Amino acid sequence: MVREKIRVSTRTLKWKCVESRADSKRLYYGRFILSPLMKGQGDTIGIAMRKALLGEIEGTCITRAKSEKIPHEYSTIVGIQESVHEILMNLKEIVLRSNLYGTRDASICVKGPGCVTAQDIILPPSVEIVDNTQHIANLMEPINLCIELKIERNRGYHIQTPNNFQDASYPMDAIFMPVRNVNHSIHSYVNGNEKQEILFLEIWTNGSLTPKEALHEASRNLIDLFIPFLHAEEEKENFHLKNNKKKVTLPLFTFHEKLAKLRKKKKEIALKYIFIDQSELPPRIYNCLKRCNIHTLFDLLNNSPDELMKIKHFRIEDVKHILDILEMEKNFA
């Protein structure tokens, strides 16, 4: 029986921004590549990333407007060129940038004649306007226009339910998606005897964040979605261990002795400049450490085993794994 050798890929995935431009204040474009990928991985990543970019990133919108002078949505106001419906549509198009949580109040209060634009909106400190020139209304006469606004941060697309305007407020359908469009394409090539792929990812945003920022946030959101599956598997393993009469009890490791030995050598090497991604840590451990702002070996050694065990999804085997890797490093020999 002849067995074929199994090719183990030792490639390192790399991504790069190959094109970036701002077509306008409300239209940014970015083109990225990721390679080298094995056959089929391009679609796997591209489809997941497209869904995450369009559906998992939060944005900020005006979701409600209120004015005492407006009898109903399709009415007109004397002295204003636009109808109430047109004004609401213009407010809906305003692009906002924020890090707020929940709902905030904003307002417009201007006196005509003149042009009302986005710069006339009085915003809370946590919100800013991407394009101050966005048009809202034209006041043709010396009248006052006062509108109370509700601003909300959310994700996806929300269709508001009409409230019959009993409180003189008008709910607006909100498109919270800061990413306007995403395309992915795949270029296949042969490297030796192995078929590989390059993933091309094109991202258009509304200016509230750059395509690079959108890519980063979508990646983080995907990681957050997959972590529970890993945790569930760990719980399943622990359950089997508890119910297994032949289970092996993990030995107690002399964490403090090992860490104390490593800490004594702190002054001999530039620990602050050795990043944890330079060590061969499994992705799950690496992500757990990064989430707790542990970026270097200096940061890592400043945490006791008890502190490391408090990290969400962290296990006792992970601490042992970290110590084993550190002891294998030449600098810690």
Curated annotation (Swiss-Prot):
Enzyme class: transferase
UniProt region (Alpha C-terminal domain (alpha-CTD)), positions on chain: 269-333
Domain of life: Eukaryota
Entry keywords, A to Z: Chloroplast, DNA-directed RNA polymerase, Nucleotidyltransferase, Plastid, Transcription, Transferase
GO cellular component: chloroplast; DNA-directed RNA polymerase complex; mitochondrion
Record GO biological process: DNA-templated transcription
Gene3D superfamilies noted in UniProt: 5' to 3' exonuclease, C-terminal subdomain, DNA-directed RNA polymerase, insert domain, RNA polymerase, RBP11-like subunit
Molecular function as annotated in GO: DNA binding; DNA-directed RNA polymerase activity; protein dimerization activity
Disulfide bonds: none
The protein's Enzyme Commission number: 2.7.7.6
Location of the protein in the cell: Plastid, Chloroplast
Ranges where the record places region Alpha N-terminal domain (alpha-NTD): 1-233
InterPro entries: DNA-dir_RNA_pol_insert, DNA-dir_RNA_pol_RpoA/D/Rpb3, DNA-dir_RpoA, RBP11-like, RNAP_asu_C, RNApol_insert_sf
Catalysed reactions, semicolon-separated: RNA(n) + a ribonucleoside 5'-triphosphate = RNA(n+1) + diphosphate
Major location (coarse): plastid
SMART domains the record matches: RPOLD (SM00662)
SUPFAM superfamilies in the cross-refs: C-terminal domain of RNA polymerase alpha subunit, Insert subdomain of RNA polymerase alpha subunit, RBP11-like subunits of RNA polymerase
Family per similarity comment: Belongs to the RNA polymerase alpha chain family.
NCBIfam families: rpoA
Subunit structure: In plastids the minimal PEP RNA polymerase catalytic core is composed of four subunits: alpha, beta, beta', and beta''. When a (nuclear-encoded) sigma factor is associated with the core the holoenzyme is formed, which can initiate transcription.
Job description of the protein: DNA-dependent RNA polymerase catalyzes the transcription of DNA into RNA using the four ribonucleoside triphosphates as substrates.
Domain comment quoted from the record: The N-terminal domain is essential for RNAP assembly and basal transcription, whereas the C-terminal domain is involved in interaction with transcriptional regulators and with upstream promoter elements.
Protein name: DNA-directed RNA polymerase subunit alpha
Source organism of the structure: Cucumis sativus
Classification of source organism: Eukaryota, Viridiplantae, Streptophyta, Embryophyta, Tracheophyta
